Amino acid sequence: MVSTLKRDEALFELIALEEKRQREGLELIASENFVSKQVREAVGSVLTNKYAEGYPGARYYGGCEVIDRVESLAIERAKALFGAAWANVQPHSGSQANMAVYMALMEPGDTLMGMDLAAGGHLTHGSRVNFSGKLYKVVSYGVRPDTELIDLEEVRRLALEHRPKVIVAGASAYPRFWDFKAFREIADEVGAYLVVDMAHFAGLVAAGLHPNPLPYAHVVTSTTHKTLRGPRGGLILSNDPELGKRIDKLIFPGIQGGPLEHVIAGKAVAFFEALQPEFKEYSRLVVENAKRLAEELARRGYRIVTGGTDNHLFLVDLRPKGLTGKEAEERLDAVGITVNKNAIPFDPKPPRVTSGIRIGTPAITTRGFTPEEMPLVAELIDRALLEGPSEALREEVRRLALAHPMP
């Protein structure tokens, strides 16, 4: 019966087109990366056939003896990678990881404090269009106008004034290190839980290149892709197993049913890869590439928000060049360089236009790009933005990309 099924040519033609787009372009979106072949093999395995509601040793379905071992392997590797006492690898996404944690630590109507989306925060840190902004009272902190760095004095003042139940540290567009110790001191002062969302920089934490939030946070959430280079999914960590038990119940049966065990297998592979010495060298190059690319663009007259970066990403203020983020994204996309338009701190333009772009180096570093090649990448970006798209420039980008094979 199965052997007579007709191949879905239309769908697989689209997959081939997407593979061609990825192979022939430069991926500079900070939240994207290329997984290894063994991660793809795990995610595409027969594990996708199995339902496994519950947790290892406590399932609501039979036949989970192998699945239990797969999930347990992912849990133990996650704990070892980040130095955590407890881990939940079932969240389908970072947003669902955050939702479960909030629901475990707060009641609807309680006060949540997080970084303003306009300053670099994430939708789930209190945006009014997100569940976090609808279920909870939200207080947002931002950055200083003069330095574009987090204003810890403002964080403390707002915390003392509003007494939040949860304070979130973490962002989707902040290029500098976080002072987790200072955030924990503020949280303790007002009796709040500190939740760190390390979705963007988890891989750098694993490699020892970014401060680890586990010694300070009550709970840490993350995605498993981005700098961690795994499949798309979520992860929750804590050094408090009692809090972990509460969060377990909120993931299942609270907001999810059956876990995606094929994706959890891919997470296990990614954790295994991140535990290898090679991952530290990869992560070092991610940061060095970001620093060098930011420096090269600054040398060409672009203003880099905060003056540089400590991690895998940076923001470019395009106003000195007379461009919007939307225009820049479109021009770069036309020559095969993918970035995303992004608001800069105190941006006067609307979110669908923006004054800036966000650039990240995890994906091109996976393909073997080195700091010595960043001047060329900066030159291609500069030419696309100032001269506009051309077939000749598109071909230059294509040749450069093909010289760095995808995994």
Swiss-Prot record:
Protein's UniProt name: Serine hydroxymethyltransferase
Chief localization: cytoplasm
Annotated metabolic or biological route of this protein: One-carbon metabolism; tetrahydrofolate interconversion; Amino-acid biosynthesis; glycine biosynthesis; glycine from L-serine: step 1/1
Gene name in the database record: glyA
Known cofactor(s): pyridoxal 5'-phosphate
GO biological process, any: tetrahydrofolate interconversion
Family that this chain belongs to: Belongs to the SHMT family.
Organism: Thermus thermophilus (strain ATCC 27634 / DSM 579 / HB8)
Listed PROSITE patterns: SHMT
This enzyme's EC code(s): 2.1.2.1
Positions that bind pyridoxal 5'-phosphate: Y51, G94, S95, S172, H200, H225, G258
Entry-annotated residues carrying N6-(pyridoxal phosphate)lysine: K226
Subcellular location: Cytoplasm
SUPFAM superfamilies from the UniProt entry: PLP-dependent transferases
